[in-house]
């Protein structure tokens, strides 16, 4: 199986290595030519995944059209706000066969359209089967060959099962799911909830308070799932894509979202933070707007959105996170 990964950030690079170790033939593309040059010369990606060696057998490709040729599976590993431009590039090359499954690994919501990542891809690549790959998988651990498990969700149950089996390995377990909407909702909201947990811990309020935020956050995932799809798959809520990823993101110092919240809770000025790689910061505003459109109240997500807009201070946010 030839797998093409578009995006050589931390997760795209780590996933490329994990899939290569699963005996896949892997091609990796990046818009950042310096990243590709360093990978080609040293096998390292010091910008996004320092200290980790990438096998020289992974093919490094500088242009999208060449990367798409002969691909049997396409994985998109770029920030959500860059997905539309990338999908337009893919579509304009006309090099992607309509039978090739497209797997999105972005955990966000498009700010302008309020569409989840999979919805953006379905709009721009309507002929290709689209799946969402999500779950508790830190790039730094994946690239070292440590065990992880994820969910592959899509509308085609049999194809999801087939892909999950082919992409899995002895250390990377991928389970198929048909809860295409619920998995995406969980993957987006968990980042916002992680920021909230980081703030609580940073303020010195302890893990009891953090657990309160997690429980409230799960209720908000359920509320959005119900409003978007009129049903809730309990196995998704308590499974890898929601609870599993939520626990990892809310407890790991390696989580950018948790670290972002932690710094805010400790008093660091939000304006001084570079949040370009913090998906939860991007998603908070969009989810706040989406909740208004859906007519639902999400106290945790709303509090983080208002904080980032400068409408609440951290003490007011704590009150809303724990007691509103």
From Swiss-Prot:
The answer to whether keyword Chaperone applies is: no
- Pfam families hit by this protein: NAD_Gly3P_dh_C, NAD_Gly3P_dh_N
Q: What biological-process GO terms show up in the record?
A: carbohydrate metabolic process; glycerol-3-phosphate biosynthetic process; glycerol-3-phosphate catabolic process; glycerophospholipid metabolic process; phospholipid biosynthetic process
Q: Which domain of life is it from?
A: Bacteria
The family line of this record is: Belongs to the NAD-dependent glycerol-3-phosphate dehydrogenase family.
Chief location bin? cytoplasm
Q: Where is the signal peptide?
A: none
Q: Which PROSITE patterns match?
A: NAD_G3PDH
Protein name from the UniProt record? Glycerol-3-phosphate dehydrogenase [NAD(P)+]
Q: Which reaction does it catalyse?
A: sn-glycerol 3-phosphate + NAD(+) = dihydroxyacetone phosphate + NADH + H(+); sn-glycerol 3-phosphate + NADP(+) = dihydroxyacetone phosphate + NADPH + H(+)
Q: Which GO terms describe its cellular component?
A: cytosol
Question: What keywords sit in the KW lines?
Answer: Cytoplasm, Lipid biosynthesis, Lipid metabolism, NAD, NADP, Nucleotide-binding, Oxidoreductase, Phospholipid biosynthesis, Phospholipid metabolism
Q: Where does sn-glycerol 3-phosphate bind?
A: 107, 135, 190, 245, 255-257
The residues the record assigns to binding NADPH are 11, 31, 107, 139, 256, 278-279
Organism of origin = Anaplasma phagocytophilum (strain HZ)
Provide the function of this protein.
Catalyzes the reduction of the glycolytic intermediate dihydroxyacetone phosphate (DHAP) to sn-glycerol 3-phosphate (G3P), the key precursor for phospholipid synthesis.
Kindly list the places in or outside the cell where this protein is found, as annotated in its UniProt entry: Cytoplasm
Pathway stated in the Swiss-Prot or TrEMBL entry: Membrane lipid metabolism; glycerophospholipid metabolism
Q: Which GO terms describe its molecular function?
A: glycerol-3-phosphate dehydrogenase [NAD(P)+] activity; NAD binding
Gene transcribed to yield this protein:
gpsA
Which HAMAP family does the record associate with it? NAD_Glyc3P_dehydrog (MF_00394)
């Amino acid at each position: 199986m030839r797998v093409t990964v578009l995006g050589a950030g931390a997760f795209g690079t780590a996933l490329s290595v994990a899939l290569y170790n699963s005996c896949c033939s892997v091609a990796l593309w990046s818009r950042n030519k310096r990243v590709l040059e360093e990978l080609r010369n040293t096998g390292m990606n010091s910008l996004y995944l320092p200290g980790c060696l990438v096998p020289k057998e992974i093919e490094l490709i500088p242009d999208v059209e060449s990367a798409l040729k002969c691909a049997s599976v396409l994985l998109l590993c770029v920030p959500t706000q860059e997905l539309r431009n990338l999908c337009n590039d893919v579509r304009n090359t006309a090099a992607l066969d309509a039978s090739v499954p497209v797997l999105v690994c972005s955990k966000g919501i498009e700010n302008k359209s309020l569409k989840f990542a999979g919805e953006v891809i379905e709009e721009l690549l309507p002929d290709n089967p689209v799946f969402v790959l999500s779950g508790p998988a830190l790039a730094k651990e994946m690239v070292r060959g440590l065990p992880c498990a994820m969910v592959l969700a899509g509308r085609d149950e049999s194809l999801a099962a087939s892909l999950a089996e082919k992409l899995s390995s002895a250390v990377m377990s991928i389970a198929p799911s048909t809860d295409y909407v619920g998995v995406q909702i969980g993957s987006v909201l968990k980042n916002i909830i992680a920021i909230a947990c980081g703030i609580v811990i940073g303020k010195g309020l302890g893990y009891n308070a953090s657990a309160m935020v997690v429980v409230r956050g799960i209720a908000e995932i359920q509320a959005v799932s119900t409003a978007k799809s009129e049903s809730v798959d309990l196995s998704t809520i308590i499974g890898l894509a929601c609870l599993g990823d939520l626990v990892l993101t809310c407890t790991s110092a390696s989580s950018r979202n948790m670290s972002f919240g932690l710094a805010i809770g400790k008093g660091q000025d939000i304006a001084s933070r570079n949040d370009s790689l913090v998906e939860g910061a991007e998603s908070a505003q969009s989810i706040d707007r989406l909740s208004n459109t859906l007519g639902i109240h999400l106290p945790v997500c709303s509090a983080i959105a208002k904080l980032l807009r400068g409408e609440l201070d951290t003490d007011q946010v704590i009150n809303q996170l724990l007691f509103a």
